[in-house]
Amino acid sequence: MPIVTIQQSPRSVEMKRELAHKITEAFVQAYEISPEAVQIFFAETSHENWAKGGELAVDWKKQ
């Protein structure tokens, strides 16, 4: 069974619902499996807990 983990900044429930549906459909078509076989985990990280290039994400918006 495919297990997908998505690490991202927080998104709305509606956005996650739509993405989960699209990812599931892609696996159903590509692997010919049932939708129930696909598991998706959303790991949301706030901008205070995420850095890139040595800078926190909260500081990216200030530049």
What are these regions (language model features)?
Residues 1-63:
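A domain-level signal for the structural core that forms small-molecule/cofactor-binding pockets
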